[in-house]
Amino acid sequence: MTFELKHRDRSHLSHHFNAILGNPPVEWKISDHLVEYPEALRYMQERVEKILAKTAHEQVWLLEHPSLYTAGTSADKKDLLAPHLFPVYEAGRGGEFTYHGPGQRIAYIMLDLKRRKQDIRAFISALEEWIIQMLASFNIKGERREDRVGVWVKQSHCPSKKNDLSSEDKIAAIGIRVRKWISFHGVSINVNPNLAHYSGIVPCGITNHGVTSFLNLGCPVTMHDIDIALKHAFEKIFGPTIDVS
């Protein structure tokens, strides 16, 4: 099943998604090269089947993609403004169009919600909280919005928009799919991508807000810095991890 979150309050939901006692640590995998989207999609689908068969453990996979657009299950063709700019892939996840590319940290989340909590709204909220806590470690205040999924930053944080107190932009997008209570797809975090590449789509179907990045906020960080902060915040919400290659 794919998941679409509509206008429903989730701020009160528990953000703790620890597994049942005795569950192995979540594997923490980092790829240091650009991963083609079809390869990543194939890997996730195979991993989900292995988790279902109990022949593989849960995993978080951190990576970057070459520049591309993906279409979620709610994508509207009119929101693809420049169809020939980059390759376009049907993702099968919830959501609409989004951009992936170098300088963006992708975290694919393959967790067994039966071992944790069979509540997809709470899972989305926990993913948002994970990103919010990660951002806080860099003194960036990320916020959730009840009418749209993802993590948002008020542009009073951005040096170029300090006088625009009403503006807010998305720094992290979330799009998941769940198959027999195993999650896949995940989150994308703008570290230092070329934000102009978003001009070929209406990101997530939202026209009245933009996108931002760590670099755009005046916070130049390395991908390694992001990975350390992500791991620390993840373990507080989802439990222990173990590094794998």
Swiss-Prot record:
BPL/LPL catalytic domain mapped to chain residues: 54-242
Active site, renumbered: C204 (acyl-thioester intermediate)
UniProt source species: Bartonella tribocorum (strain CIP 105476 / IBS 506)
Binding, substrate: R93, G94, G95, E96, F97, T98, Y99, H100, A173, I174, G175, G186, V187, S188
Pathways per UniProt: Protein modification; protein lipoylation via endogenous pathway; protein N(6)-(lipoyl)lysine from octanoyl-[acyl-carrier-protein]: step 1/2
Protein name: Octanoyltransferase
Reaction(s) the record says it catalyses: octanoyl-[ACP] + L-lysyl-[protein] = N(6)-octanoyl-L-lysyl-[protein] + holo-[ACP] + H(+)
Entries under PANTHER family matching the protein: LIPOYLTRANSFERASE 2, MITOCHONDRIAL-RELATED, OCTANOYLTRANSFERASE
Protein family per UniProt: Belongs to the LipB family.
GO cellular component terms, semicolon-separated: cytoplasm
